[in-house]
From Swiss-Prot:
UniProt main location, coarse: membrane
Keyword Iron-sulfur in annotation: no
GO biological process, one term: xenobiotic detoxification by transmembrane export across the plasma membrane
PANTHER family assigned: MULTIDRUG RESISTANCE PROTEIN (PTHR11206)
Listed name of the protein: Protein DETOXIFICATION 30
Organism from which the protein derives: Arabidopsis thaliana (Mouse-ear cress)
Transmembrane segments: 64-86, 91-111, 136-156, 161-181, 197-217, 227-247, 277-297, 302-322, 349-369, 393-413, 419-439, 447-467
Family: Belongs to the multi antimicrobial extrusion (MATE) (TC 2.A.66.1) family.
Any one GO CC term of the record: plasma membrane
UniProt KW keywords: Membrane, Transmembrane, Transmembrane helix, Transport
Membrane topology according to the record: Multi-pass membrane protein
């Protein structure tokens, strides 16, 4: 189309050198040949990473706490209310969360690289295109909410829990559409290093959420319906606040208004979004499978209770890893877009070192206090003993799971989602799960065997990702990023999608 050609020429006629970005390097770092040079560049990069990772970690914790706070208040209503909210939050909303966050992660690649190259006008089109795709996905996923009761009954939940969860899930349908707008919007802002404003919005949302939930439960006595109203409202508050921030003009050229271009070249965008979703969901569901398999052991109640405590701790520590994942994804995509391959590679190295140190510190603390911390979660002596026995593998898991998301963040920043999805399938589901079941059931190692086997799958996946990154030609990746940016309107290159 002539209109396409004109816009393409306009984009490509922009200044050849991208403008200096607030937290992107003005030029590529020189080769590092001395210890002093390494320390100097390390200190510079650490500041850039933590400028992004700090607010991202805080934001992850506050948004994670919305559901956690709702569960706490549900426990004051009734046992069945707590069960309903917990199952909806972990199974129904958890499944949708993985799909939506994964599909929204496509913007980390496209917006991050376009921003790094200074092609700001493309970001708004990418954002709108993702809104279209994720809202269509939300319509499909809403069927999961509508039919939650029969689905849960089919997989073995009791009639009482299935019925109560089914009703609460229907109340929570607005949440899935909030996800559809929120995650692309968050990635759009994240790619521009505007994470501080998202952290502030999430903090305000959490404070209001706790106050309003207390009011509708203790004051108005609305029960689970009140919990749903407030939780939906909290997520939509985050969405509206972010949109107001964008529409106010604070993003400059990155948002120039709504455009019909959002409906062009959707299939290429869908392919990258699906690859991102598959990559993330395979990781999220893998951790859920550990508890599922533990439920079929002889002492299922004790095994599941102990493993749930460990997974709860692992979940909170994962918020740190998720924040670092977001930071390194932005840094790598920005630097590749700006044609700074050495800086992108060094940013990865700094992130891996930082994440490893944090993971080791947390793990050592758990090992030191392994005789004390389990009693904070449970009073049953049998469960406490199992948690103590699982602490060493929990410590190893924390270290591995602190590094692995950083490597995945690089994959997103570089646009390797489809390849990593295949790696996850083989490492997790072809190797990890069968090995865990072999150790847990056939060799009678129980819950520890299941977890050890599946952790081995994560270790193999981490090794494969490390091997891929070590073999990467970062100059080639920078050139590929430039090629993607030159595809006007976001038509993703075959190199990105295959």
């Amino acid at each position: 189309m002539e209109e396409d050609k004109i816009l393409t020429e306009t984009l490509l006629s922009a200044a050849e050198e991208p403008p200096a970005l607030p937290f992107s390097s003005v030029e590529d770092i020189p080769p590092i040949t001395t210890v002093g040079g390494f320390v100097k560049e390390f200190n510079v990069e650490v500041k850039k990473l933590w400028y992004l990772a700090g607010p991202a970690i805080f934001m992850s914790i506050t948004q994670y706490s919305l559901g956690a706070a709702t569960q706490v208040f549900a426990g004051h209503i009734s046992t069945i209310a707590l069960a309903a909210v917990s199952v909806e939050n972990s199974v129904i909303a958890g499944f949708s969360f993985g799909v939506m966050l994964g599909m929204g992660s496509a913007l980390e690649t496209l917006c991050g690289q376009a921003f790094g190259a200074g092609k700001l006008s493309m970001l708004g089109v990418y954002l709108q295109r993702s809104w279209v795709i994720l809202n269509v996905t939300a319509v499909i996923l809403s069927l999961l909410y509508i039919f939650a009761a029969p689905i849960l009954a089919f997989i073995g939940q009791t009639p009482a829990i299935s019925s109560a969860t089914g009703i609460f899930s229907i109340y929570m349908i607005p949440q899935i559409f909030a996800y559809a707008v929120n995650y692309p919007t968050a990635k759009f802002l994240q790619s521009q290093s505007k994470i501080m404003v998202m952290a502030a919005i999430s903090a305000v949302a959490l404070v209001l959420h706790v106050l309003l939930t207390w009011f509708v439960i203790e004051g108005l006595q609305w029960g689970t319906a009140g919990l749903a109203v407030v939780l939906n409202a909290s997520w939509w508050f985050i969405v509206v606040a972010q949109l107001v921030y964008i529409f106010s003009g604070t993003c400059g050229e990155a948002w120039s208004g709504f455009s019909w271009e959002a409906f062009h070249n959707l299939w290429s965008f869908v392919r990258l979004s699906l690859a991102s979703a598959v990559m993330l969901c395979l990781e999220v569901w893998y951790l859920m499978a550990v508890i599922l398999f533990a439920g079929y052991l002889k002492n299922a109640e004790i095994s599941v209770a102990a493993l749930s405590i460990c997974m709860n701790i692992l979940g909170w520590t994962a918020m740190i890893a998720i924040g670092m994942n977001a930071a390194v994804s932005v840094r790598v995509s920005n630097e590749l877009g700006a044609k700074h391959p050495r800086t992108a590679k060094f940013s990865l190295l700094v992130a891996v070192i930082t994440s490893t140190v944090i993971g080791l510190a947390i793990s050592i603390a758990l090992l030191i206090f392994r005789d004390k911390y389990p009693s904070l979660f449970v009073g049953d002596e049998e469960v406490i003993i199992v948690v103590k026995d699982l602490t060493p593998i929990l410590a190893v898991s924390i270290v591995i799971n602190n590094v692995q998301p950083v490597l995945s963040g690089v994959a997103v920043g570089a646009g390797w989602q489809a390849v990593v999805a295949y790696v996850n399938i083989v490492c997790y589901y072809v190797f990890g799960i069968p090995f865990g079941l072999l150790l847990g059931y056939k060799l009678n190692f129980g819950v520890m065997g299941i977890w050890c086997g599946m952790l081995t799958g994560t270790v193999v996946q981490t090794i494969v990702l490390t091997w891929m990154i070590c073999r990467t030609n970062w100059d080639t990746e920078a050139a590929m990023a430039e090629g993607r940016i030159r595809e006007w309107g976001g038509e993703v290159s075959d190199q990105l999608l295959n």
